[in-house]
Each structure stands twice: as C-alpha cells, then as structure tokens.
C-alpha cells in the first residue's frame, strides 16, 4: 500500500528525470509568457491583432490556471500605465515609486490597482464579459491556480509542487518585477520616447519580446 504511494510521489504519472521536468517547466512558463504578451498585451490591451475565438479562449483558460489574473484588470492597469506613464498615477513606475518597490513589490502594486474600481471602469472597455468570465474566471481565480497545482502533482509527483511554485512566480517576477521595474530603469534606448522605458535585451525570447520595452512604448 505504501510503496505505490511513495512511487507516485517520487515521479507522478510521467515519471521523468529531473532535467526533463526542468525543460517541461520552462516550456509551461513560456506558454504563460506567450499568453500574456499575445493575448492580454497585444490583442486585448492594445488591439494590435484579433485572435480566433478558440485561440483567445485557450489563452484565457491557461492564464486562469497559471496566474489567476482577470483579463479586464490586467488590461485596465496596463492601459492606465500607458496613459499616466511615469507620473504619480502610474500603477507601477519606478520613476515615481522607486525601483526597489516596483521590482520587489510589483505584484502587490498590481493587486492594489486591481482593487481600484475607477481604474477598472475607465480602462476595461472591450474586454470579455461573457458568462464564463463573470461566473468562473472573474470569481474563482483561486480555483484555477488550485487546478494547476493538482495537475502538476499528478504529472510530476511531489516535485509538481515546485513546478507549480515556479509557474505561480513567473509572471510576478518577469512581468511585474523585470519588465515594469527594470524596463523603466536600466537598459538601452533605440528611440527617444517621452517616458523612461528601456530595452533590457536585444533578444526578445525569454519574456516573449517584452524585453524590447523602449520599442514598445515608442510604437
């Protein structure tokens, strides 16, 4: 009785080597990055492209499980960031709030602004407002993240808890900390934009192209 349980906890359903779990974890986090940059950022916030409904809903579903974020909140906060960039009203500017605050407390700044009903009401236009958004994704973000935890443990065993923790930390670290913080504080500039946005790296691979933040704020 005990041996099967120990065996399951040691490897889960997939029973992979540690390096295979590492590669899969990085792959899963990249799906999250792609979901944020293509769906939330380019499609929803800036209306730069239209996605097939099936593709758009896959991104919504994945983000519900991998981040617990609500589309209208992310979009509204990002639009306000562009509208009020580097001012005291910017939700996450290191120019007004300090680089240490944005880098280490970026997720807290996001959650605080998500509770600002005026921000959401003013900047949420055009975001999904269907039944599943109102009754599932918007109301039960914790259920999505809990579902991801269960899936990770089933697939990877006890190591799935670590996989899940990395997934949950990925956007707070890369987006809230690195892009919103470092991307307005340190790096190089291809263009003289009216804000402090910088390019962190010329290769937009790790964070889905968001590393080229000066380019984005200019165009």
Predicted regions and their residues:
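Non-catalytic, topology-defining segments of multipass membrane proteins
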Residues: 1-178, 182
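Active-site-proximal inter-transmembrane loops
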Residues: 124-131, 186-212, 216-219
């Amino acid at each position: 009785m005990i041996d099967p349980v120990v065996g399951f906890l040691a490897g889960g359903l997939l029973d992979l080597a540690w390096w295979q779990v590492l590669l899969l974890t990085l792959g899963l986090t990249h799906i999250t990055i792609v979901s944020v940059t293509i769906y939330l950022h380019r499609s929803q916030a800036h209306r730069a492209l239209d996605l097939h409904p099936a593709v758009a809903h896959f991104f919504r579903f994945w983000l519900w499980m991998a981040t617990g974020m609500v589309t209208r909140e992310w979009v509204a906060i990002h639009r306000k960031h562009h509208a009020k960039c580097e001012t005291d009203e910017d939700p996450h500017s290191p120019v007004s709030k300090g680089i240490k605050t944005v880098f280490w407390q970026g997720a807290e700044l996001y959650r605080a602004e998500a509770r600002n009903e005026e921000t959401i009401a003013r900047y949420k236009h055009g975001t999904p407002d269907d039944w599943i958004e109102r009754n599932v994704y918007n109301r039960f973000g914790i259920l999505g993240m809990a579902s991801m935890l269960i899936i990770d443990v089933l697939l990877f065993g006890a190591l799935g808890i670590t996989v899940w923790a990395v997934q949950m930390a990925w956007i707070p670290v890369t987006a809230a900390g690195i892009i919103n913080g470092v991307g307005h504080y340190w790096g190089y500039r291809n263009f003289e934009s009216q804000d402090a946005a910088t390019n962190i790296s010329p290769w937009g691979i790790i964070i889905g192209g968001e590393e080229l933040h000066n380019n984005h704020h200019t165009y």
